Amino acid sequence: MPLVFIKDIDTDTRLGLWKIADELHADEVCPQMVCEELKRKCARRQKETVAVYALLHAMTGRRDLVIGHNADGKPTLDGYIISVSHTIGYASIIMSKTSNVAVDVEYRNNRVFRIVDKFLTKQETALLNGLLQTKDTTLKTIASLTESHDAQTALLLCWCAKETIYKYFSEEKLMFDEMQICLEEFGQEGTFYCTNLRQDIKKTITYMQNEEFVLTYTL
């Protein structure tokens, strides 16, 4: 079954992850109006949308719910605060009845090495270099460590965390340098911090990662 997990974070908040597969049909999981909208989307977007609605049904037991979007592009859902993320192979939803929430999932890939300077500050890069003990003076930045699984994991955690915080504070449209990562260690799952520097608000980022994906969320 493509459902990877549904996890109750607290009494009002649920997190779900779905592995995108070809066998799903839109009319099995999507409301009629969503099925009509799908006809105007490319094949990849169709698969992502169907996976999201399959997961939504698994999490709520309802097929009538329609995900909308506000002026900032943030997903909306009657009766819930919701955040949605999808990447190659996976779709994730976090939803709460009472609290703001945000989630991001990213498949493992080395693209993240090419954009280090885009989303990490020099201070954050130095922090990660220290964390990974890259003392070799011939290595200018963490971007040089493309063969390192740990380096890839650390970068993906930082990328997903900033995407998560951007979604959480969607009205502010934060820039990457307005978010500061504090990642001192990491494993298969755990927590670290990311601060909205514009408001000086530190948020706890909860993460999980394996050989296929990295996922982060906050509430």
Model-derived segments and their meaning:
Residues M1-L219:
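Core catalytic alpha/beta fold that binds nucleotide/phospho-ligands
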